Design a protein with these regions (language model features):
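Charge-dense, helix-prone N-terminal extensions
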Residues: 1-118
Length: 118
């Protein structure tokens, strides 16, 4: 298992086709959560505060995932479906051919932060 020192190392190790998408998600999360710190937890990059993970992201072989609180996914389930994306209890998967909308990244991150109370 590879241990990543930081977000840059994680993105650099991801499949080349996914790197721009990961960089975009990272930038949007950083903009949306300016007071959160960049963290690596469970071998994934994320943004956290007060020891909690507000939002994280990951790369797989052909797609990426954005991971937030269960309540955030529930609150935006219609928006996720309208974007043609698939959601689990705590995540949304997307690909370069069907990226996650900019405003959905922000909405999910803010809803997750609110639910966590940080």
């Amino acid at each position: 298992m590879t241990v990543f020192a930081d977000h840059d190392a994680y993105i650099a190790a991801a499949p080349e086709a996914l790197q721009p998408l990961l960089a975009f998600v990272r930038a949007r999360l950083a903009q949306t959560l300016p007071d959160a710190e960049e963290i690596i937890r469970y071998d994934m990059p994320g943004f956290g505060s007060a020891g909690l993970i507000i939002a994280g992201y990951a790369a797989f072989s052909k797609q990426c995932g954005l991971y937030v609180s269960k309540g955030a996914i529930s609150a935006y389930s219609d928006d996720i479906a309208a974007a043609g994306l698939k959601a689990s209890k705590t995540g949304v998967t997307f690909s370069p051919s069907k990226p996650i909308p900019d405003e959905l990244i922000a909405a999910l991150a803010l809803a997750s932060r609110k639910e966590l109370g940080v």
